[in-house]
Each structure stands twice: as structure tokens, then as C-alpha cells.
Amino acid sequence: MTREREPGKSRTKSGSGTTDQVFCSFCGRSAQEVNSMIAGPKAFICDRCIKTSFDILRKEVNAVPPVAKVPEQPFQPRLVSPKAIMDSLGQYVVGQDAAKKSLAVAVYNHYKRIDSQEQQQADDEVVIEKSNILLIGPTGTGKTLLAQTLANLLEVPFSIVDATSLTEAGYVGDDVETILARLLHAADFNLERTERGIIYVDEIDKIARKSANVSITRDVSGEGVQQALLKILEGAVVGVPPKGGRKHPEQQLININTKNILFICGGAFEGLDKLIAKRVSKSSMGFGAKVKTTQIGYDPEILKLVMQDDLHEYGLIPEFIGRLPVISTLEMLDEKALRNILVEPKNAITKQYKKLFEMDGVELEFTEEALDKVVKIAIERGTGARALRSVLENVMIDIMFEIPSMKNTHKCVITADTIENKAAPEYFSGDRKKKKIA
């Protein structure tokens, strides 16, 4: 009776017992005949066969004629006039005209500065400095949307980072190099595109120094992060781990020059209005001037009077404030603005829902009363435009669950009762009204 040999192995008997002998699965040589043997799941290969395979592959590669490389065009962001930038922002962002105008001019000058660097003479005495931007405004006023829309318009890589996740190097959390790693990923690892991208740092007010007094304990997520950000905000060559951070310390670093990266920082800066009002009240003493107050506290116009000293008192260090020369404030959205946000922008949330329903062959309609009710609930929540989607999503989830199964339905009308009480919307099939299917 003969027994088949397991691939790459044979069993031999000796005086000390039975042993397995290993053979190369390609040439048949035993482990004793070669220098090394590499084992796979069901096969073995010796060093001689590896060398032979390598020589064959090298000959095949060399036999292929080289492909002529077309020289790549240098990456050039779209240089759009400030007026065109503002008009484009207006298609997606409702209101905030002062902030849009300020952003449009700052962004235009930033990329114009980049274009002029190549033409600038070495002996030119005038050097245009970088114009990073600080956006100050309540939650849900459009800070992130403005930055995102700018990047889309200019066709440059864009990345968002939450400042609250950042800590000093050596502490648990993300270090500032993570910001650049995310932009590198957004640019598909194209270094030239990365170095002309836009980074939006959200919640920048959360890294304000916790106290005006110098503390003996280290503030690793406040002043320490501000100090770490100074270098990349101003412009420096930073070694960035492509996989992002401290989890892969062995990876090779990619050097990114940040001098042409535009940084837009945004935050609500809750309580800043009180600091400004305090300063204004002191400076106006003796002249009978008073700071006007409203139901929401200080005059909404008060933030427009912000100065660098106010930001310093709030907790930002002077060096950090100096890296953000363009300061723009956003207004609290009123009822009319929120109503317009629901229906006017190109990507308005109601238009998005209508598009989704259209894919199922259903026409979606919101009554005027329903839209008013959405705005009213959003205002009560106090989170600005951000609440609009939350209110609608809470109502629409059940309807979107049912619609794909309602094959004969051609129209769905959302009423005020649907928004307020989650009552059934009005369904239409041809000329007949249908009730909601439970």
C-alpha cells in the first residue's frame, strides 16, 4: 500500500524515529540542498527558485517599452474676483453679507498673493503676509458652510478639524500635525494641492486659556495647543505622518510647507459679547452712552466691535491672535433668515428631501404653515440653522420608511400638523387622497 506525499514534504524513518523532510514545490530540491526554504500554507519555495523568478520578472519588465510621461500642469486654484466669490456664496449661504464680503476679499488676496510669489523679484521690498481668518458667531450661523463653500468654489482641497480634539505633543489626543495629515488625505496625497488647500479649525474658542493668570499646571488643550498651532498658521515646513499621528511612529514623514495653506478658524466665543460690552461701557462713561440690550442679552451688533484685546482677555494669546489678522463676525439668524434657509439655497434641506422622494417617483410638498412650524421649533432649540435639519429629520424618518412600499402614491404633502404632532401627511394617488399606512 502506497501513501501520497503531502505537497513539499516526505516522511522518512531513521534510528531516532520518523521525521518530515521539506522539498521545494517548484524544483524539488530538499532543504539540505539549498540555503533557505520559505514555507507557505501548502507549498515551499527555495532561495534558488526565488532568484530565478526575480530574473524572469525583471526581463519581462525591461522588455516593455517605457511610457512617455506627459508633464503635469502645476496646480492652480481658480482665482475668482471678490464679487464673484460673494455671489457664489450667496447661492448656498443665506444672509451674513458682511461676513461673506470679508471672506471674499481675504480669500481673493490670499490666492493672488500665491500667484504673485512666482513673479516677485528677489529685491522686492513689499512682502504680502498671509491672511488667515477668524470667524466669530453663534452656533448654527453658517461658519463651517462658508468655509466649505469657498473650498468647493476654488476647487482646492478642504479639511475640517475640531480644535477640542487637539492636545500638545506627548499627551493623549491629536497633535497639530493631524490637521495637515487630513488635508493631505483630502488632496489624495498630492503635495502641491495640499500646500494650497484650506483648513477650517472649528471650536477654536474652546482652546482659549482657562485663566488669565499663569498656572503652575500645564494646560495641554488650551494655551499649549495655541502655541503648537502658531508654527503652521504662520508658515513652516512640517513633517507629517501620512497615516496621521502617534499610532504609527515608524512611518516616514512627508514634509508639507504651510505658508500657502489658508486657515479659517471659527468659534461661538460664548461670553465674548459681555467682555466687549464691558469695555465699551467703560470707554463711553461720562458721555451718557449705554449698551443696548435685548431679550437675548447684549445688543447683537456688539460682536462687530470686537478688538484683539477682547480676544486676549477671553483667553487667546497675543501671538495666536496676530496669526489671524482677518476677523469677521456672523449675526444670529432671525426667523426670516431661517425661513429662507429652508427653501432658497441650491442645496436647501427641503430641496434635498424633494430630490430623494423624486427618486421614488413621488412629488413632495411642504405647506407654508409646515415651514413656519419648522422655523418656530428650530428657534426654540436655539441652535440656529443646524436645528432645521434635526427638526425635519425627526419628522421625515417614518415617512421615508413607508414611501418606497407605497407603489401607487404620486404625491406627499407635509402639513403643520405633521411637523408639530407627527400626524400622517396627505398622500395622493391619482385624484384620490390616501391615508398613511401604519
From Swiss-Prot:
Q: Name one GO molecular function term.
A: unfolded protein binding
Q: What's in the keyword line of the UniProt record?
A: ATP-binding, Chaperone, Metal-binding, Nucleotide-binding, Zinc
Lyase as a keyword of this entry, yes or no, is: no
Residues binding Zn(2+) are 24, 27, 46, 49
Which CDD domains does its entry note? Answer: RecA-like_ClpX
SMART domains recorded: AAA, ClpB_D2-small, zf-C4_ClpX
Keyword Transcription regulation attached: no
Q: Which domain of life is it from?
A: Bacteria
Residue ranges the record marks as coiled coil: none
Give the quaternary structure. Component of the ClpX-ClpP complex. Forms a hexameric ring that, in the presence of ATP, binds to fourteen ClpP subunits assembled into a disk-like structure with a central cavity, resembling the structure of eukaryotic proteasomes.
Question: Species lineage, top-down?
Answer: Bacteria, Pseudomonadati, Chlorobiota, Chlorobiia, Chlorobiales
Cellular-component GO terms for this entry: HslUV protease complex
* Sequence ranges assigned to domain ClpX-type ZB in this UniProt record: 12-65
- Give each disulfide bond as a residue pair: none
Q: Which Pfam families match?
A: AAA_2 (PF07724), ClpB_D2-small (PF10431), zf-C4_ClpX (PF06689)
Tell me the function of this protein.
Answer: ATP-dependent specificity component of the Clp protease. It directs the protease to specific substrates. Can perform chaperone functions in the absence of ClpP.
Protein name as annotated = ATP-dependent Clp protease ATP-binding subunit ClpX
Concerning its family, UniProt says: Belongs to the ClpX chaperone family.
Q: Which InterPro entries match?
A: AAA+_ATPase (IPR003593), ATP-dep_Clp_protease_ClpX (IPR050052), ATPase_AAA_core (IPR003959), Clp_ATPase_C (IPR019489), Clp_protease_ATP-bd_su_ClpX (IPR004487), ClpX_bact (IPR046425), P-loop_NTPase (IPR027417), Znf_CppX_C4 (IPR010603)
Question: What are the BP-aspect GO terms?
Answer: cell division; proteolysis involved in protein catabolic process
Annotated ATP binding lies at 138-145
The organism encoding this protein is Pelodictyon phaeoclathratiforme (strain DSM 5477 / BU-1)
